[in-house]
Amino acid sequence: MNNHVSSKPSTMKLKHTINPILLYFIHFLISLYTILTYIPFYFFSESRQEKSNRIKAKPVNSKPDSAYRSVNSLDGLASVLYPGCDTLDKVFTYAKNKFKNKRLLGTREVLNEEDEVQPNGKIFKKVILGQYNWLSYEDVFVRAFNFGNGLQMLGQKPKTNIAIFCETRAEWMIAAQACFMYNFQLVTLYATLGGPAIVHALNETEVTNIITSKELLQTKLKDIVSLVPRLRHIITVDGKPPTWSEFPKGIIVHTMAAVEALGAKASMENQPHSKPLPSDIAVIMYTSGSTGLPKGVMISHSNIIAGITGMAERIPELGEEDVYIGYLPLAHVLELSAELVCLSHGCRIGYSSPQTLADQSSKIKKGSKGDTSMLKPTLMAAVPEIMDRIYKNVMNKVSEMSSFQRNLFILAYNYKMEQISKGRNTPLCNSFVFRKVRSLLGGNIRLLLCGGAPLSATTQRFMNICFCCPVGQGYGLTESAGAGTISEVWDYNTGRVGAPLVCCEIKLKNWEEGGYFNTDKPHPRGEILIGGQIVTMGYYKNEAKTKADFFEDENGQRWLCTGDIGEFEPDGCLKIIDRKKDLVKLQAGEYVSLGKVEAALKNLPLVDNICAYANSYHSYVIGFVVPNQKELTELARKKGLKGTWEELCNSCEMENEVLKVLSEAAISASLEKFEIPVKIRLSPEPWTPETGLVTDAFKLKRKELKTHYQADIERMYGRK
């Protein structure tokens, strides 16, 4: 089989519209600056280059199927952050005692909310937000203790399930800490899940209590509570909705404040509570998986602690000066793990949302500040979809610059790329050229962590350069408590996900059908298996799937079969090159990696999203494309095509024009002829988690996309 497209990022092309004399002078200044700064940077860059090039992981023996471990954990895998802190309640107690009066959780006050009429007549809600208001470690501990005690008074028993269906906010983390303290098993549900998925999860886990928000209660839960017969108590984190008459008899609605007050009163009477064991379930995390109904992954206290131990080791100098911005779904293992890492190290966590993240975000009123401008975070996690969006938005702005500004940006970009490859910094470029781009995320970001899906080399290098910080690309699954690998901060290579964390080991298993073997040259390849304390307990009430994906070796260590295909590079870093489920055999016998096709085309300015499709009954690949509205409209103008947005997307002529652009890009990316889409369908509607066509991490839900576009599939292949 062929490898993925090359991960080496290319330089930006210079537009030859700048005065040659001026261009020569700029090049002269760059050369002079490089010479003057060579000696001071030499000693620093040598150290950085040495770290970047060093061996980061090694096989533990000489066999082809040997597991790889971080060089920092060859003698044994790490499993705890702090001695004696083997459950999450102990970790928080340790942090509370150490950072007692330090700020922990921050929320912005809503000063004003108003309706804004758009040119197309639609009404958007806009908000003006104030400063961040903070709760200290002590405040959060007391609130969590009281809330847990209040839940106990409502009948919640240790080792029984309680659900949280809520947006990312401080109350989510307070509720989670309460459950960890009182040994309640926390069932997490994405706020974007549809009704059938919510009903399935709540009934499967047999919850009697659910924690939610006023908005989600009104928009999603209200219509399905009658389908969840065991439900008795609904706790809203932000006050009661105005009417209650519609709720079935037997369901009582409480506010979080009322439950906390009940718990505070009861705690005066020294109500005892059950402490968890490391092996007890902490979270049952329902994944908004890419196939079928969501599955609940059982994650123990020891699983999560091992995972955050490994993650924390990859963030140098993590501590009280750091500020993390929380906006991804806390029901996603990446966000939950990242926040627990910060909480355990004295960092502040300021809450946000995708709609209020930046000054230009959709809910922020023009002229007021978004959350990153107010919080100025130093740490941030993101999924590739968000980074791709930032990349495309900035590049659109660059294309609108004057010729001189655009060429100056490109010169600085290419110069910095060259310097980064040598381990050097570029403080002048950072200050004068990239300062405005960096300010989009507050200006203080020192580390961006990306996970949830593969990040393209182009986007990763762009974020490195323009935001003046390393991008730690990670790899992990809900089934591995979010942990697996993270690239080191001084490793500026792209297209890889780093070496195994100190909490786990990784081996490659032969996959004959795909043609991947751990004896392959020059690099071993195969299905990625993850082993260690991070490997979770399996799927809730799904023994067959658990047996298929998990196993124990002769030493009693648990392993997870990920279904992803990887290869180890000589320095011990892992590269994701394929996925078993994404591999399709065409009618003529060729194998096509759908993920490879999508990765080659997704970063085109014309493409907002793309899903490649093929099956074994046909000899060619087709695709569904969400085009970029601005780029498609401009292409239509150039080709003399007119119509509304929907008419353009439904136009055969427009499909053919877009297909030409895709085909050229596919050839440039060295795709084989049989891998290049032959026909496409343009979608006028974006794919969001709300549509059910992508997960909350914006991974494609192939089954749902196939169903959604079934008529188009039949059209493109010809009905048989």
UniProtKB/Swiss-Prot annotation:
Membrane topology, as annotated: Single-pass type III membrane protein
Catalysed reactions, as listed in the record: a long-chain fatty acid + ATP + CoA = a long-chain fatty acyl-CoA + AMP + diphosphate; (E)-hexadec-2-enoate + ATP + CoA = (2E)-hexadecenoyl-CoA + AMP + diphosphate; (5Z,8Z,11Z,14Z)-eicosatetraenoate + ATP + CoA = (5Z,8Z,11Z,14Z)-eicosatetraenoyl-CoA + AMP + diphosphate; 15-hydroxy-(5Z,8Z,11Z,13E)-eicosatetraenoate + ATP + CoA = 15-hydroxy-(5Z,8Z,11Z,13E)-eicosatetraenoyl-CoA + AMP + diphosphate
Modified residues (Phosphoserine): 683
Primary subcellular site in the record, as a coarse category: mitochondrion
GO MF: arachidonate-CoA ligase activity; ATP binding; long-chain fatty acid-CoA ligase activity; medium-chain fatty acid-CoA ligase activity
CDD domains assigned to the protein according to its UniProt record, in alphabetical order: LC_FACS_euk1
GO CC annotation terms, alphabetical: endoplasmic reticulum membrane; lipid droplet; mitochondrial outer membrane; peroxisomal membrane; plasma membrane
Gene Ontology annotations of biological process type: long-chain fatty acid metabolic process; long-chain fatty-acyl-CoA metabolic process; neuron differentiation
SUPFAM superfamilies: Acetyl-CoA synthetase-like
Keywords: ATP-binding, Endoplasmic reticulum, Fatty acid metabolism, Ligase, Lipid metabolism, Magnesium, Membrane, Microsome, Mitochondrion, Mitochondrion outer membrane, Nucleotide-binding, Peroxisome, Phosphoprotein, Signal-anchor, Transmembrane, Transmembrane helix
Entry-linked InterPro entries: AMP-binding_CS (IPR020845), AMP-dep_synth/lig_dom (IPR000873), ANL_N_sf (IPR042099)
Annotated EC: 6.2.1.15, 6.2.1.3, 6.2.1.2
Topology, Cytoplasmic side: 42-720
Family: Belongs to the ATP-dependent AMP-binding enzyme family.
Protein name per the record: Fatty acid CoA ligase Acsl3
Gene that encodes it: ACSL3
